[in-house]
């Protein structure tokens, strides 16, 4: 076939296509956001969601069962061990030792609980909050959408007289939904140069301790700090051994949160908060003197970094609580002398 014949069979060119329609979401912004900045703000938003969900859950549970919780605290403090168990169970239910401590201090001011019984409840509350770390470490965060769906639908379409019970279920699921979002953003965020540089500042136990205590005082919740620490370790952002000091600092910061909370209450509440802060300091001394040498054997018991943090967190709180409960009959009179009744 010659060239003239081949030209007769040439395919015509495609007509020009009209420009594609752009939505408002495709319009470039004037601020050039990088993927690292997007991840950072997503992580901050998830942390804020976690913090508010935790507080809302504690508020909903307290509003629904506050009177029952008060009766439970009043009846189940026959001895120091029963009081500690009561505090642990109460804090595990409401996911906040601060809420249990505040209710306990209020009951003591009203002469419903003795100051000694109230302190045993506060000792146990420190142990009860360790449940949060175990739930996160065991990846219960995947159940968040289920609880959010069930609680949300129940509060909207359930029987009218029972709809309020859907609110705490909704917020409980929202806690784990936020944790799941945090987990999904921390892993890629841990690879950015800015975060790697920041993580390098937590290179010593003292810095990690101060960071944990300061962050707890800022957000007013050790559960938030411990939960974030478990996720950070699982995502490779913090080394497991350094994360232990962040958790110890979070426990130390809880005592100072109780001190600030008690400033609006009477002298009995201030004495209790001082006792609680002293317990955290004694726990820190015990950890520095004894428990830090057992970190490596404890970490070896668990295969995953998140479970390792949860185990050491529980060991720290259980050791401090056991020490306080066993020595309570002998040290109580000295505590009352050391912190006078009209302490400011």
Language model segments and positions:
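Transmembrane alpha-helical segments and their short flanking loops
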Residues: 179, 186-201, 265-344
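Alpha-helical transmembrane segments and their lipid-water interface positions
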Residues: 59-62, 98-102, 129-136, 148-149, ...
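Short, positively charged and aromatic/hydrophobic N-terminal segments
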Residues: 24-27, 33
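Alpha-helical transmembrane segments of multi-pass membrane proteins, especially transporters
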Residues: 67, 71, 75, 79, ...
């Amino acid at each position: 076939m010659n060239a003239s014949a081949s030209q007769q069979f040439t395919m015509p060119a495609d007509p020009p296509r009209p420009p594609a329609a752009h939505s408002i979401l495709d319009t470039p912004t004037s601020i050039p956001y990088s993927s690292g900045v997007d991840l950072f703000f997503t992580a901050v938003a998830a942390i804020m969601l976690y913090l508010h969900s935790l507080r809302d859950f504690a508020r909903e549970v307290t509003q629904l069962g506050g009177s029952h919780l008060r009766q439970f605290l009043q009846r189940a403090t026959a001895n120091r061990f029963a009081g500690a168990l009561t505090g642990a169970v109460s804090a595990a239910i409401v996911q906040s030792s601060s809420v249990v401590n505040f209710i306990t201090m209020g009951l003591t001011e009203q002469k419903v609980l003795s100051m000694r019984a109230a302190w045993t409840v506060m000792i146990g509350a420190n142990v009860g909050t360790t449940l949060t770390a175990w739930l996160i470490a065991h990846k219960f965060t995947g159940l968040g959408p289920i609880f959010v769906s069930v609680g949300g639908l129940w509060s909207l379409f359930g029987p009218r007289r029972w709809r309020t019970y859907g609110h705490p279920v909704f917020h409980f699921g929202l806690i784990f939904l936020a944790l799941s979002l945090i987990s999904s953003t921390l892993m890629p965020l841990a690879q950015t140069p800015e975060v790697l540089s920041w993580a390098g500042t937590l290179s010593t136990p003292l810095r990690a301790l101060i960071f944990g205590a300061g962050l707890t005082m800022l957000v007013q919740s050790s559960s938030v700090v411990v939960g974030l620490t478990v996720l950070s370790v699982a995502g490779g952002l913090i080394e497991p051994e350094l994360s232990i000091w962040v958790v110890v600092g979070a426990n130390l910061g809880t005592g100072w949160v109780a001190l600030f909370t008690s400033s609006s209450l009477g002298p009995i509440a201030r004495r209790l908060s001082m006792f609680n802060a002293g317990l955290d300091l004694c726990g820190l001394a015990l950890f520095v003197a004894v428990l830090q040498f057992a970190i490596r054997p404890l970490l070896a018991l668990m295969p995953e970094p998140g479970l390792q943090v949860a185990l050491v967190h529980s060991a720290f709180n259980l050791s401090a609580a056991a020490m306080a409960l066993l020595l309570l009959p002998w040290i109580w009179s000295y505590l009352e002398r050391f912190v006078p009744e009209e302490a400011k």
